[in-house]
C-alpha cells in the first residue's frame, strides 16, 4: 500500500468517507471541493453538503462495506479522507492499490471534544484555509468558555444518558465515560449515565 504522496498546489477535489469530516468542510465554506462522500442525501444534516448531493455536484460513493471503487476512481480525487478503524484501513489499502492517495483522519482517537474539533485545521491545510480553520477554533473556544463560566454558578447539574439508536437493528448504543462525549458532559457540569460494568466506550442495550 502507498503511505506517502505529494499534492501540488491547493486541493480542489476530495472524497470523504466519514460523516464527521463533512462538517469541517462546511465550516470552512469548502464543500465545493467534496466530490464524493459516504453520506446519503436523506441522511445528511450538513445543509451545504446535502444541497451538493441533491444537485449532483457531490455523489454518494457507498460505505466501507459497499464502497463503489470504480465511481471513486472516476471522480479522480486528489485525496480521500478515511477514518482510522480497522474496516477503514482495509478500504484505504484497496484504494491505494489503485493509485489513489488516502489520508487517515484520526479524530476518533481524541478523548477531548476540543481535540476532535481541532482536526478542522488538517482540512484547512489541504484546502488553503489554514487561518480560517485556526480562527474557527479560536472563536468557538471563546464561546465554549463563556458557556462553561455560566455553568460554574449553576445550582443543578444533570445526569445525562447519551446514546445512538440503530435503525438496522433493535438496540441502543449507550456511551460510557471512556468515550469522548464524557468530556462534553463533565465540562458542562453533568454526569454521564451508563452501566458501571461497561469497559468499552459504548455498550449495546436491546429494546
Predicted regions located by residue number:
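Alpha-helical, coiled-coil/dimerization segments enriched in small aliphatic residues
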Residues: 171-206
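Extracytoplasmic substrate-binding proteins
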Residues: 13, 57, 70, 74, ...
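A short, structured surface patch at a secondary-structure boundary
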Residues: 1-73, 79-86
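Short, surface-exposed amphipathic charged segments that create phosphate/polyanion-binding patches used
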Residues: 52, 117-122, 175-176
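Short acidic active-site motifs
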Residues: 67-68, 90, 204-207
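Short, structured coil segments at secondary-structure junctions
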Residues: 30, 98-100, 188-189
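Long, compositionally biased, intrinsically disordered segments
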Residues: 5, 12-17, 28, 38-40, ...
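Amphipathic alpha-helical segments that form well-ordered structural scaffolds
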Residues: 24, 71, 122, 180-187
Amino acid at each position: 500500500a502507498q503511505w506517502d504522496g505529494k499534492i501540488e498546489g491547493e486541493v480542489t477535489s476530495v472524497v470523504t468517507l466519514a460523516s464527521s469530516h463533512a462538517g469541517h468542510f462546511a465550516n470552512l465554506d469548502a464543500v465545493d471541493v467534496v466530490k464524493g462522500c459516504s453520506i446519503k442525501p436523506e441522511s445528511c444534516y450538513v445543509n451545504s453538503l446535502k444541497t451538493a448531493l441533491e444537485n449532483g455536484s457531490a455523489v454518494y460513493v457507498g460505505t466501507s462495506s459497499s464502497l463503489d471503487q470504480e465511481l471513486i476512481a472516476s471522480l479522480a480525487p486528489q485525496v480521500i479522507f478515511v477514518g482510522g478503524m480497522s474496516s477503514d484501513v482495509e478500504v484505504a489499502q484497496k484504494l491505494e492499490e489503485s493509485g489513489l492517495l488516502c489520508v487517515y483522519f484520526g479524530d476518533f482517537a481524541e478523548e477531548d471534544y476540543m481535540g476532535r474539533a481541532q482536526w478542522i485545521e488538517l482540512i484547512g491545510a489541504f484546502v488553503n484555509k489554514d487561518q480560517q480553520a485556526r480562527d474557527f477554533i479560536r472563536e468557538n473556544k471563546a464561546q465554549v468558555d463563556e458557556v462553561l463560566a455560566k455553568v460554574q454558578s449553576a445550582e443543578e447539574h444533570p445526569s445525562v444518558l447519551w446514546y445512538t439508536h440503530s435503525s438496522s437493528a433493535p438496540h441502543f448504543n449507550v456511551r460510557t465515560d471512556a468515550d469522548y462525549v464524557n468530556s462534553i458532559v463533565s465540562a458542562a457540569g453533568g454526569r454521564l449515565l451508563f452501566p458501571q460494568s461497561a469497559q468499552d466506550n459504548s455498550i449495546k442495550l436491546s429494546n
